[in-house]
Regions:
Chain A
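Iron-sulfur-associated redox domains of electron-transfer enzymes in respiratory
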Residues: 1-172, 190
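Active-site-adjacent beta-strand anchor residues
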Residues: 73-76, 179, 240
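A generic "binding-loop/recognition-motif" signal
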Residues: 79, 185, 237
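Alpha-helix boundary/capping residues
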Residues: 87-90, 179, 257
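Short Cys/His-rich metal-coordination motifs, predominantly Zn2+-binding knuckles/fingers
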Residues: 129, 182, 234
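Ferredoxin-type iron-sulfur electron-transfer modules in oxidoreductases and energy-metabolism complexes
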Residues: 151-177, 191-289
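Oxyanion-binding "anion nests"
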Residues: 182-190
Length: 289, 166
């Protein structure tokens, strides 16, 4: 942690960056912090409560942050995938951001929890994490902590996959009926950066704005399609959802399908093209007559 | 005349590319091939222009089945539109399946401008398949904002029932 504060002080002090985006202690657990003054670098913390994907603050949809000047951003391995995604899709220039990678031993499900990792408290995404050390960074801090415990219970994605079709339909109908269409899943997502979202279009209105199960299904199908092969798997949409809809299940399922089908895993190497937007002439097409 | 029970006639929307399948469907027509009349054709420049939302919207508006059809690989008028579409629909089809939609309601096919017979087969097969599956009431029933209220009990139940309000 001292290493992090030291680095932030140095980067801000010599003018390399104008703002360090990191984590600080808040009244309700850890929260994101924008540090612009080297004297304030003491506020920075990093532990297992640092759940947030701070890459979302690099999103060009947030011009007020861009106005602060060149940022340095603290990223875990999973967040680095989102930064790489934004660089890959020309939303951020590599030279316009200083990436401070931190080696991660897993995070808890919610930043208001205690920093102790247990099978009941560990974030589901950390269970099979293969990128606890980011590969995309300018500075890499900390020693690699021990691997996090596996989350309790069986794999929820496989559980839904194994349901019979009508049961799956009923499951999602029930889950999506709670959606209030606040679009928090979109707002929090680092990879959702369209200036005008199709969900906000009214002429023609592709996606109804009312929160009926039908409109909610349209919205999530669209969002997940746009995330296919791009989702960094940070799980922020699920955490932001006020109705506790398990959106990560859909995204994780699609990510697995993309990997099975196209051999592509979302990675923190910006030079590897994403599977949508690229193609092979011999892609399998068993479902096409 | 003996009255028969009305048979379910599915509504099927076909999103087709202008250069191959639309021309192929035109050929089927000018060749006087007989095929099921259930398909409404929507012509688009290319299968690459077909957003998965089109399919969602078709179901929302009451379609029981959807056909997506375009040029064979390597035949795209725009060189690569169908390759992009192939990847997109491979993912979308699996996504719909994961959400509990019966993907047998959707047919993907490549029909070239000279394959009038293949178009007829695609139309007839899809119509027969969707007919067997029946109306897509699951999706169409989603339009109700709230699940129907339980039948009223006790005081005042009969009056509200008489008014037809739940």
């Amino acid at each position: 942690m001292n290493e992090l504060r030291e680095l932030a002080r140095k980067l801000l002090g010599d003018g390399t960056v104008k703002v360090v985006i990191g984590y600080e202690e808040g009244p309700r657990g850890v929260r994101p912090a924008m540090i612009t003054d080297p004297a304030q670098a003491e506020r920075l913390v990093f532990d297992a409560r640092c759940v947030h994907n701070l890459a979302t603050y690099l999103n060009p949809r947030r011009p007020h942050l861009a106005r602060l000047g060149k940022p340095a951003v603290v990223v875990k391995g999973c967040d680095a995938r989102a930064v790489a995604g934004m660089i890959r899709e020309s939303q951020v220039k590599r030279e316009d951001v200083v990436i401070v990678g931190v080696r991660c031993g897993g995070v808890v499900r919610d930043p208001t929890m205690k920093a102790a990792l247990a099978p009941e408290t560990v974030s589901p995404r950390c269970g099979h994490c293969a990128s606890r050390e980011p590969k995309l960074f300018d500075h890499l801090l900390g020693a690699l902590p021990p691997a996090p415990p596996r989350p309790a219970g069986d794999d929820p994605v496989a559980r839904v996959e194994q349901m019979p079709l009508p049961e799956r339909w009923a499951f999602w109908k029930e889950e999506l009926s709670r959606c209030v269409r606040c679009h928090a899943c979109r707002e929090v997502c680092p990879m959702c950066f369209c200036a005008a979202c199709v969900a906000d279009k009214s002429r023609p209105q592709w996606i109804e704005t009312s929160s009926t199960p039908r409109a909610n299904l349209s919205w999530q199908l669209t969002r997940v399609m746009h995330m296919a092969g791009r989702c960094a798997g940070c799980g922020e949409c699920t955490r932001a959802c006020p109705s506790h809809i398990p959106l990560s299940l859909i995204l994780a399922h699609v990510a697995r399908h993309v990997e099975r089908r196209f051999g592509y895993q979302v990675d923190d190497d910006p030079s590897i093209p994403a599977p949508i937007g690229a193609f092979k002439t011999d892609d399998s097409q068993e479902f096409i007559l | 005349m003996a009255s028969e029970a009305p048979q379910f006639e599915p509504k099927i929307v076909a999103f087709v590319c202008n250069w191959c399948t639309y021309t192929g469907a035109d050929l089927a027509g000018t060749s006087r091939l007989q095929m099921a009349p259930n398909v409404r054709v929507v012509r688009l420049p290319c299968t690459g222009r077909i957003d998965p939302l089109f399919i969602v919207k078709a179901f929302e508006r009451g379609a029981d089945g959807v056909i997506v059809s375009g040029c064979h690989p390597a035949d795209c008028h725009y060189t690569a539109g169908n390759y992009h579409a192939r990847r997109r629909f491979a993912i979308f089809r699996d996504l719909l399946d994961f959400m509990g939609v019966d993907v047998r309601r959707i047919t993907f096919s490549w029909v070239s401008a000279s394959e009038g017979g293949k178009w007829r087969d695609v139309v007839n097969d899809t119509t027969a398949r969707v007919k067997e599956l029946g109306p897509f009431t699951e999706y169409q029933g989603l339009s109700d904002p709230w699940p129907p209220a339980p039948p009223p009990t006790g005081e005042g139940a009969s009056s509200s029932q008489a008014l037809g309000t739940p």
